[in-house]
Design a protein with these regions (language model features):
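Periplasmic c-type cytochrome electron-transfer domains
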Residues: 5-439
Length: 439
């Protein structure tokens, strides 16, 4: 195997000229390296609203009231700790960083009593929807070189509050851990044309990989658009993603979602005078939160010249990881802000859906995404997860406790890459993991 001693110039620039060189505990919360003065001011204001706890209304703190009446978290940063990912559990109970999407077989509107997402908290005088307990089943898997690893599979128990009525007997719940936010503005700036160029929904090239776009209804434009955010690519852009998170995670209404999303049984039980009119967050503050997200920079790759990292880069491509985790994309010329335009980026994602097999399936359909299909998560910044968030919980529900465990959970379209990884020598495995941890 041949490789150059030194990385190509600029290879560490994961976000082009937006890249920041910070590998410390605040690596995920840095503004774009090329941020303008006006966007820096908006970034600072947006950061304040992202991190501060919202309070119940009415309150003397009118700029931050409107929490609930049903909610899951009090702030954006409660789940996205330091702009990173959440942790799935706290002993046997689930943490704030893990939420649950709800569904009923054959329907796309959620549970008729509890709605589309479980609200574990509520305002005074209002009943929460319930809680979830979790336990893990361990199983051992082997490698060709006789090494073994232990994988854990979560089992969830819904403890529903019958105050609003009993949920559907076939209720499904999909755990969703909060994702890291680095570089999301750059991902938003990748054109639909670029994303669709990598799609192959019918696997016409016969390589076993069938990246599929998800098309969703955009509540702001009132149009069917390409999804790119969320675990199942169910949000079109950062405005709709942010508005959905405000509403479903915190019960905060916005210009995009100006009314609470209650089920009919909840409307009968909740005092509707608690509901704000106009929306809890106005467009000016909302746009600053969106600008904050758009201007979060991806950290640079580390140790790009390390021989082990170089070998791992080659192996990443050789065993098929890069078929879905596409290393390089380019942003378009019509990005929301100038700093994001025409940037060569290295997010290691195609922003498309892939069938990952029954082992990771939750049965919940989301627009065109089936219960076993997931959007390829970006890998930039993954090696700093432990430094920033103090854990290495990966995949949509945080079941994987390491990058290796995440690889071993790959099924469906990821099966071949998992098999190829399992057959690597211990030294080659170390090189591959060193490369991924350098991102």
């Amino acid at each position: 195997m041949h490789f150059s001693l030194f990385a190509e110039p600029g290879v560490e620039l994961s976000g082009g000229s937006t890249t920041v060189f910070n590998a410390g505990p605040n690596a995920f919360g840095m503004p774009l390296a090329n941020i303008s003065r006006s966007n820096r001011r908006a970034h600072v204001v947006g950061n304040s609203f992202f991190n501060k706890n919202w309070v119940f209304s009415p309150s003397s703190t009118t700029a931050r009231d409107g929490l609930g009446p049903l909610f899951h978290a009090r702030s954006c940063s409660s789940c996205h700790v330091k702009d990173g990912r959440g942790a799935p559990t706290n002993d046997s109970s689930t943490s704030i960083g893990l939420l649950f999407r709800l569904s009923v077989p054959g329907k796309s509107s959620g549970d008729p009593v509890l709605g589309v997402q479980l609200a574990t908290k509520a305002a005074p005088g209002v009943e929460p929807e319930g809680t979830v307990n979790v336990r893990y089943e361990e199983k051992e898997v082997g490698f060709d070189n006789l090494k073994t690893a232990s994988l854990r599979k979560p089992q969830y128990e819904l403890i529903a509050n019958d105050h609003y009525g009993k949920p559907h007997t076939e209720i499904q719940f999909g755990p969703r851990i909060a994702q890291q936010l680095v570089g999301v503005g750059l991902l938003e700036a990748v054109t639909d044309k670029t994303i669709l160029a990598n799609a192959d929904p019918n696997d016409e090239d016969g390589d076993g990989i069938s990246g599929k776009p998800n098309y969703i209804f955009n509540p702001e434009s009132k149009k069917r658009e390409l999804g790119r955010f969320g675990w199942k690519a169910n949000e079109a852009n950062l405005r709709t993603q942010t508005a959905s998170a405000f509403l479903r995670d915190m019960g905060i209404t916005s210009p995009i979602h100006p009314i609470e999303d209650f089920t009919e049984p909840q409307k009968e039980k909740i005092n509707l005078t608690l509901i704000a009119n106009p929306p809890d967050i106005d467009d000016s503050k909302f746009e600053r939160v969106v600008t904050y997200l758009r201007t979060l920079a991806p950290p640079a790759q580390r140790n790009a010249n390390d021989p082990s990292v170089k070998r791992g880069d080659i192996l990443f491509n050789k065993i098929g990881c890069s078929k879905c985790h596409i290393p390089t994309l380019r942003t378009g010329s019509d990005a929301a802000i100038d700093e994001l335009k025409n940037q060569p980026i290295k997010p290691y994602t195609d922003l498309l859906l892939h069938d990952m097999g029954e082992g990771l399936a939750d049965g919940i359909q989301d627009s065109l995404a089936s219960g076993s299909e997931w959007r390829t998560p970006p890998l930039w910044g993954i090696g700093l997860t432990k430094t920033v968030n103090g854990n290495t919980f990966f995949l949509h529900d945080g079941r994987a406790r390491s990058i290796e465990e995440a690889i071993l959970w790959h099924g469906g379209e990821g099966s071949e890459s998992r098999k190829n990884y399992s057959s690597l020598s211990l030294d080659d495995k170390d090189d591959l993991l060193n490369f991924i941890n350098s991102l």
